[in-house]
């Protein structure tokens, strides 16, 4: 995550949308722990077909949510999308030009298509194995500004 933390766009950002990682995603839990008191970090909470945003004030305040993703369930709803400076987005696959394949429910595409996100810098975090040359694009798909490819550790038995 140091690659991300060294980016000027991250250093300038005050309000950051990020995700609490699942086991098969680039890990963000240490990042959340390190930055939750220095920057305003927002995490998505699944509510029906939409993602609500809530502030992550401390890792200990997170609970397993609907999809077994850690969520700040007891924090107030965040609605000031226009104040978000940076969005860090997970995915299953990415292309070098910013296309993203999610898990198929469209949660992030619906969230990021909100006009308030138009000026938000969007970064996808990927392992090298998640990079592909091309992905199908639907009209509702939101393209990312940058893909950061982070090293992974593979254990082989």
Can you name each region flagged by the protein language model?
Residues 52-157:
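Conserved phosphate- and dinucleotide-binding cores of soluble alpha/beta proteins
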Residues 1-82:
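N-terminal active-site beta-alpha-beta segment that forms phosphate/nucleotide-binding
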């Amino acid at each position: 995550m140091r690659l991300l933390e060294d980016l000027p766009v991250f250093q300038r950002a005050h309000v950051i949308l990020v995700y609490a990682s699942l086991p098969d995603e680039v890990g963000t839990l240490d990042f959340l722990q390190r930055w939750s008191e220095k920057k305003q970090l927002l995490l998505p909470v699944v509510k029906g077909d939409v993602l609500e945003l809530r502030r992550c004030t401390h890792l200990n305040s997170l609970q397993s949510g609907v999809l077994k993703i850690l969520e700040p369930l007891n924090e107030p709803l965040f609605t000031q999308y226009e104040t978000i400076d940076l969005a860090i987005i997970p995915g299953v696959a990415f292309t070098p030009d910013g296309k993203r394949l999610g898990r198929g429910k469209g949660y992030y595409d619906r969230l990021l298509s909100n006009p308030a996100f138009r000026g938000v810098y969007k970064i996808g975090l990927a392992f090298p194995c998640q990079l592909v040359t091309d992905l199908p694009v639907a009209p509702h798909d939101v393209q990312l500004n940058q893909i950061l490819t982070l090293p992974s550790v593979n254990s082989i038995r």
